[in-house]
Amino acid sequence: LSQNISSLISKNLFERILVHRNDRACGAKGFYTYEAFITATKTFAAFGTTGDTNTRNKEIAAFLAQTSHETTGGWATAPDGPYSWGYCYNREQGSPGDYCASSQQWPCAPGKKYFGRGPIQISYNYNYGAAGSAIGVNLLNNPDLVANDAVVSFKTALWFWMTAQQPKPSAHDVITGRWSPSVADSAPGRVPGFGVITNIINGGMECNSGSNALMDNRIGFYRRYCQILGVDPGNNLDCANQRPFG
């Protein structure tokens, strides 16, 4: 295994993919750096290093696409198109609530809010707690680190990407071809491909309801990034006919 994916995604490619993230209209201007991304990937050595070069590039494209959707500042007539505006934000927009759920293992810290932050917009105390434990940072007490420290921010997104949360597989295992659907997955239409990753992330809102703008936006980012990285996006890109997990 290579411990570094910079041989596949150079700083120049990273800038082409996330071309407008430092636009003055973006709330996270200057936050998401290439160096922070590469540093964070070293904590998750299998990311972007599993399988052949085509598979590795597809994983990078899929990760950056899903997280670009979560952080997009794009709109239909945006300069260079809506899929050039990923990584525009590092915290949930509007007036988000506390996102505090009852948990013995990961109790909420007084006065802290666990709304969406970072590339995957990690939410809820139980995700902040588990992610922090995995990367060695106390995020229950310091959730704002995910919007203030770019390396920590990328690490939370990579933790979510690499970690299976039953009954869901990890996005990593799906995109690298290591997930084989069970009978319980196949019957509801959950098949390997980019679409089931959308199901993992937000299936309850976006899947099994035909075509919708949110799901299609994720696919749009993925197609653009695959084109830049020179890989075929593969089959089963949507989850229109997939029932959510669980």
From Swiss-Prot:
GO terms for cellular component: extracellular region. It catalyses: Random endo-hydrolysis of N-acetyl-beta-D-glucosaminide (1->4)-beta-linkages in chitin and chitodextrins. GO terms for biological process: cell wall macromolecule catabolic process; chitin catabolic process; defense response; polysaccharide catabolic process. InterPro entries: Glyco_hydro_19, Glyco_hydro_19_cat, Lysozyme-like_dom_sf. It comes from the Eukaryota. Keywords: Carbohydrate metabolism, Chitin degradation, Disulfide bond, Glycosidase, Hydrolase, Plant defense, Polysaccharide degradation, Secreted. Pfam families: Glyco_hydro_19. Its main location: secreted. The keyword DNA repair does not apply. PROSITE patterns: CHITINASE_19_1, CHITINASE_19_2. It is an enzyme of class 3 (hydrolase). Defense against chitin-containing fungal pathogens. This is Basic endochitinase. It comes from Solanum lycopersicum. The gene is CHI14.
